[in-house]
Amino acid sequence: SPAMLKKAEEALKNSPSTYELVEENLNENLAIINASVVVLNYTLQFVQPENRVSVMQNIYNGLVPGGSLVLIEKVKSEVPELNNTFIEFHHQFKEQKGYSKLEISQKREALENVLIPWTVNENSNLLNSAGFSTVDLFFKWNNFAGFIALK
């Protein structure tokens, strides 16, 4: 969103690194050219599953040799009982941060069939199938995970 890009721009204004912040619809064709690093924070989970392979291939193709993708996503557990427990933990966390049960319920309903999480294995397989030579999990907390993928 423009507001998120503005905050990112403010946070990076003194950075000596070269960067480009882009607002795009990932369900459409994404043009990435000559990138050293691509970061997707809680983004791919909103891309329709049938479009995720082409999104990953576009990212892979747009990275320079040795480039990397940092992917952080909401994930679902391979074990349904754990998945439900993790979701409940997350709702408790939101309540502790001041959200009401109604707000939590409304957000969950709004994201139903829009946010479609995959398992850690499904995400890893997606990255491997796109051509990344190295894929590793660098972060996992309940139903959230971070991956690093190297070209």
Predicted segments, located by residue:
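Class I SAM-dependent methyltransferase SAM/SAH-binding core
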Residues: 1-29
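A conserved beta-strand element that flanks and buttresses the S-adenosyl-L-methionine
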Residues: 39
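Short catalytic micro-motifs in class I SAM-dependent methyltransferases
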Residues: 42-45, 73
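A short glycine-rich, Lys/Arg-flanked "PGG" loop and its adjoining helix->strand segment in the class I
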Residues: 53-65
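Conserved beta-strand signature within the Rossmann-like core of class I S-adenosyl-L-methionine
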Residues: 66-74
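C-terminal alpha-helical "lid/dimerization" subdomain adjacent to the S-adenosyl-L-methionine
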Residues: 74-130
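Core SAM-dependent methyltransferase catalytic element
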Residues: 124-151
